[in-house]
């Protein structure tokens, strides 16, 4: 009995199923060309100056620094670094997936994109743990208020993110396809078996575990504040806003991306029709900018976390605008004596 050979022979009679063994044509190039550059462009144009203002505000205006201030500053830095990778990806997808920046930059941009994505997730998790300790166990966790604890926690987050994402530099590379140099996404690379297990471990440790921690932290916080007889109404309102922002970030921005990335990789390993595989790929493409949309939510988070942040931002912007006006007046005066 030659059942495997007969199966392959029969499969070859149906182009869709024959293609499912790795020869499916990517029919989603128009979606990548028109959807990804536009969404990434909007995110960059809003997020980059927004996070630059946030960082300037935290460094020059926010005093004294608290543990939450240090975590938020690190979060803003990682969001800014994350956003710097978007112009390269915008150019890549807008040009029909033609990578012109070389193999090193391909690895670096893909690494930077994922490194800062997971740093952002872990900083949000770290912030949630600190909030939980301050509200639920204020006396036993008194030392967590010290900035030294926040500095150590942030250093640990950077190290974990680096260790988690550095294998990606070996799995991602630029390759020549149809006279074009392509910088492949993790799910489109060739080392499928290695990528499958790496992706599962990466997703479990740097997303699923933080998701559970953040959910438990904020459900406990809300339950405690709701049933607390002497809890200040302002504190309750602030906790609710933080809960909504954090859970929206994890369940709306990060969750669809990670679920569809797992499904996308599995679809390349399974014997399914090309039409189904392309539909899965299309859904995965749509989910990718959702992860970047988290940078919008973080801009709101900075305002909710600190009562003085909004005033400090206004002060920073006013100083910048007045400085530019003063410089313009000097230039105008020097040109017209």
From Swiss-Prot:
Question: What biological process terms from GO does the record include?
Answer: G protein-coupled receptor signaling pathway; phospholipase C-activating G protein-coupled receptor signaling pathway
Effect caused by changing residue 288 to A: Markedly impairs itaconate- or alpha-ketoglutarate-induced intracellular calcium response
Question: Which PROSITE patterns does the protein's record reference?
Answer: G_PROTEIN_RECEP_F1_2 (PS50262)
Chain ranges on the Extracellular side, renumbered to this chain = 1-34, 91-116, 173-201, 264-284
The keyword Disulfide bond is assigned to this record: yes
Bilayer topology: Multi-pass membrane protein
What is the protein name for this chain? 2-oxoglutarate receptor 1
Which organism is the protein's source? Homo sapiens
């Amino acid at each position: 009995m030659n059942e495997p050979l007969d199966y392959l022979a029969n499969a070859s009679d149906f182009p869709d199923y024959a293609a499912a063994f790795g020869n499916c044509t990517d029919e989603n190039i128009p979606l990548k060309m028109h959807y990804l550059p536009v969404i990434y462009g909007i995110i960059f144009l809003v997020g980059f100056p927004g996070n630059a203002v946030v960082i300037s505000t935290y460094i020059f205006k926010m005093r004294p620094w608290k543990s939450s201030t240090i975590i938020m500053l690190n979060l803003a830095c990682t969001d800014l670094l994350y956003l710097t990778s978007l112009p390269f990806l915008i150019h890549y997808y807008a040009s029909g997936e033609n990578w012109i920046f070389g193999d090193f930059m391909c690895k670096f941009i893909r690494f930077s994109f994922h490194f800062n994505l997971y740093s952002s997730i872990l900083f949000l998790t770290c912030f949630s743990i600190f909030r939980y300790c301050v509200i639920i166990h204020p006396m036993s966790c008194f030392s967590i208020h010290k900035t030294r604890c926040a500095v150590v926690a942030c250093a640990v987050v950077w190290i974990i993110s680096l260790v988690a994402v550095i294998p990606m530099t070996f799995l991602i590379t630029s390759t020549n396809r149809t006279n074009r140099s392509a910088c492949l996404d993790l799910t489109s690379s060739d080392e499928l078996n290695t990528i499958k297990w790496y992706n599962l471990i990466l997703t479990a440790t740097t997303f699923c575990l933080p998701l559970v921690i953040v959910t438990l932290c904020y459900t406990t916080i809300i339950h405690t504040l709701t049933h607390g007889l002497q809890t200040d109404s302002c504190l309750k309102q602030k906790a609710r806003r933080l809960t909504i922002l954090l859970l929206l970030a994890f369940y709306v921005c990060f969750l669809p991306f990670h679920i569809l990335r797992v499904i996308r990789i599995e679809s390349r390993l399974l014997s399914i029709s090309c039409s189904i595989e392309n539909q899965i790929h299309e859904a995965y493409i749509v989910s990718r900018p959702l992860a970047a949309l988290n940078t919008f939510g973080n801009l709101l988070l900075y305002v909710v976390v600190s009562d003085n942040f909004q005033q400090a931002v206004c002060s920073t912007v006013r100083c910048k605008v007045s400085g530019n006006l003063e410089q313009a007046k000097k230039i105008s005066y020097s040109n017209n004596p």
